[in-house]
């Protein structure tokens, strides 16, 4: 099965594009959703998080307090490394098991992994057969995140500064979706890539 890594900067529209591919029959594994799963109440990462950061890292319902942890790791690279050392192996384990289940079921023409930090992680570039980048201008990113999350412009810029640059993402892309235009243009691009991915997967092509 052809496996594609979908990535893009914050506010680029990764989730929307992934949903459009899912509607066309693609299998989707979203690593952000897996991260939420393991840090939900009773999640696999919770005991290790409490041991590393104390009970103050949890919300009253027992889930990881994402806002509190975001503030901690933003200011402390060592804390960021500790958090990733807990969550990343669990996410990789879940990703591998879900992918095996999808391949075994044989119900989807191809598999898309949604990985916000695909370029930054490095390992993902060796795992997937193709890289699909959802791209838009930085001004569009900023406007979308300010509207969606209620962040200030400075907060959005600080997040973007921690991510790969637009040029770095585009440099590793096999395919690019321009998400600066109207929904009709986005739909046409998804339709074209869906046809391409189906054809490649049917032909047994797993690498770009």
From Swiss-Prot:
A single GO cellular-component term on record: cytoplasm
Keyword Metal-binding found: no
Domain DPCK, residue spans: 3-208
GO molecular function terms listed in the Swiss-Prot or TrEMBL record: ATP binding; dephospho-CoA kinase activity
Protein residues bound to ATP: 11-16
GO biological process: coenzyme A biosynthetic process
EC number assigned by the record: 2.7.1.24
Cellular location(s): Cytoplasm
Family matches, as Gene3D superfamilies: P-loop containing nucleotide triphosphate hydrolases
Pfam families in the cross-refs: CoaE
Broad EC category: transferase
Keywords: ATP-binding, Coenzyme A biosynthesis, Cytoplasm, Kinase, Nucleotide-binding, Transferase
Highest taxon above the source species: Bacteria
Main location: cytoplasm
Pathway per the UniProt entry: Cofactor biosynthesis; coenzyme A biosynthesis; CoA from (R)-pantothenate: step 5/5
InterPro entries: Depp_CoAkinase, P-loop_NTPase
Catalyzed reactions: 3'-dephospho-CoA + ATP = ADP + CoA + H(+)
CDD domains per the UniProt record, alphabetical: DPCK
Biological function: Catalyzes the phosphorylation of the 3'-hydroxyl group of dephosphocoenzyme A to form coenzyme A.
Family the entry assigns: Belongs to the CoaE family.
Name used for this protein in its record: Dephospho-CoA kinase
Source species of the chain: Cupriavidus pinatubonensis (strain JMP 134 / LMG 1197)
